[in-house]
Design a protein with these regions (language model features):
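Small-residue-rich hydrophobic transmembrane alpha-helices
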Residues: 47-107, 111, 144-158, 162-163, ...
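Transmembrane helical elements of multi-pass membrane transporters/channels
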Residues: 16-35, 136, 203-207, 211, ...
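Transmembrane alpha-helix boundary and packing residues in multipass membrane permease domains
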Residues: 21, 25, 36-37, 73, ...
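Short runs within selected transmembrane alpha-helices of multi-pass transporters and secretion channels
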Residues: 68, 137-155, 163-174, 196-212, ...
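Short alpha-helical transmembrane segments in multi-pass integral membrane proteins
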Residues: 1-21, 75-142, 188-245, 301-366, ...
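Helix-terminus/linker motif at the lipid-water interface of multi-pass membrane proteins
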Residues: 26-48, 117-124, 180-191, 252-285, ...
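Structural signal for membrane-spanning alpha-helices in multi-pass inner-membrane proteins
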Residues: 109, 178, 182, 211-215, ...
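N-terminal transmembrane alpha-helices
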Residues: 9-37, 41-42, 58-70, 74, ...
Length: 450
């Protein structure tokens, strides 16, 4: 990050930060995309099992990665104030925090996931695949969270290209391991859908090893003196948790409601479960666009707010939201035109392709709502405003989705689509609430400037 003097310089800097994050996010979401698509090519039953497993995994994992992402605004404020010497200390505290959170998530996966999956009415083979997938995926919990901390450090320093290059390694690693383990190639045991979980875990262990080497060899990072290990500092840990818990909670509130809907799909046929998850999986991949805008906004806004350049922060807000709208126009057009082709990536059965294409039509409205709501979340994080947005997210996601979905399911013949309608309306409501909160926060900072 560096100070800019005019709109053109701000646009150039914003795009320099945004595009590597976008590619990074695509690579990040590609792990789930590859797991789902390759399992779908194996068979529909295993795809349904992986779908149910990810419905349990995603909320908890995104909750914890949301917590460690608090490192971005913390370092952003340090840099804005010219206190670069504080960076290494906060980095190490978040490493310790990530290790502790890994143990928590491991316990949840091992002890809670199997009972849940075995008592929601799944067909026995589907439940068996889901349990094995989660157990294999849990092997990669530690590298997943530690890499999230390293990535947050690099992003907050403006080294988003480095994050991008590292994350681009994930796709070939994950695809290669998945091919071996799902289909049993070259004499490797054939694990089916469960092998996708092990493939992802192995890919992240390799990625973590490479990231650590880069961290200590990168010339731009040597000034931080990361080679000097800094002991545990409970005050900084508490600050990180205080800021990160609402961020993680907000992400959890959003992802968990999607997962609950995924679990509710268990009452429908395996074909509907597989089609729902395939459409949701591709929607998550497309979410990389607004999510990247959100991450870039958190970086640039936190820097300008830390430097008390509130007018510059406001300029970045406008740039970010216009960028989100422009990209949305392209992604929505692409998905509408090629929704049938996208559906065929996940399976060959004509009925499956037709049903998945219908779900993808509903996902167009997801993306439109996310274009409005997601950048606002990043902006609020840049202002270090995380607690109130957490409660707003709870109201928007949990207070709207299920009531609306159940009304549609009971009073109409929309069936499984009722729950997608509930999700769409909840995203719109959440976006309106976040916009109201941003107006309040910006007025508060404007009054301080005066």
């Amino acid at each position: 990050m560096y100070k800019t003097k005019c709109l053109r310089e701000k646009l150039v800097l914003f795009l320099k930060i945004f595009f590597p994050i976008l590619i990074y996010q695509f690579a990040n979401y590609s792990a789930s995309f590859v797991d789902t698509a390759m399992t779908g090519q194996y068979n529909t039953m295993d795809l349904a099992g992986v779908s149910m497993a990810t419905s349990i995994w995603n909320p908890f994992f995104t909750f914890l990665t949301g917590i460690v992402s608090a490192l971005v605004p913390i370092i952003g404020h340090h840099l804005g104030r010219g206190k670069k010497e504080e960076v290494a200390s906060d980095f190490y505290q978040f490493i310790y925090l990530a290790l502790g959170l890994s143990v928590v998530l491991l316990g949840l996966v091992v002890f809670l996931a199997p009972p849940v999956l075995n008592h929601i009415g799944l067909e026995a083979p589907v439940a068996a695949v889901a349990v094995r997938y989660l157990w294999f995926l849990s092997i990669g919990i530690i590298p997943l969270l530690l890499f999230s901390v390293i990535r947050s450090l690099l992003d907050s320093l403006g080294l988003t290209k480095l994050s991008m290059y590292l994350m681009l390694l994930l796709l070939p690693l994950n695809s290669g391991f998945n091919y071996l383990l799902i289909f049993g190639a070259f004499g490797v045991p054939e694990l089916g859908g469960a092998g996708a979980g092990l493939g992802t875990s192995l890919a992240y262990w390799v990625l973590l090893g490479i990231s650590i080497l880069v961290l200590f060899k990168q010339e731009k990072l040597k000034a931080l003196h990361l080679e000097k290990r800094i002991p545990l500092n409970m005050d900084k840990i508490k600050e990180g948790v205080r800021l990160g818990l609402p961020i993680g909670g907000t992400v959890f509130a959003e992802v968990a409601i999607f997962s609950v809907v995924g679990l509710i799909m268990a009452k429908f046929s395996s074909l509907i479960i597989a089609s729902h998850q395939s459409a949701m999986n591709f929607s998550s991949l497309m979410y990389a666009f607004p999510m990247s805008i959100s991450s870039a906004m958190a970086i640039v806004v936190s820097y300008e707010v830390g430097a008390k350049q509130f007018d510059d922060a406001k300029t970045y807000i406008g740039l970010g939201r216009w960028t989100a709208l422009i990209f949305a126009a392209f992604t929505l057009s692409f998905l509408y035109i090629f929704r049938g082709n996208v559906a065929s990536l996940y399976g060959n059965d004509p009925e499956f392709i037709d049903l998945t294409a219908r779900f993808l039509t509903y996902s167009l409205f997801f993306q439109l709502a996310d274009t409005f709501a997601a950048p606002l979340q990043g902006i609020l994080r840049g202002y270090k405003d995380t607690v109130i947005p957490f409660y707003l997210g709870l109201v928007g996601y949990w207070g709207v989705t299920l009531p609306v979905a159940m009304v549609f399911d009971s009073l109409t013949d929309f069936g499984a689509y009722s729950y997608w309608i509930g999700l769409i309306i909840s995203l719109i409501v959440s976006g309106v609430l976040y916009r109201w909160r941003l107006t309040v926060i910006m007025k508060r900072f404007e009054s301080r400037k005066a």
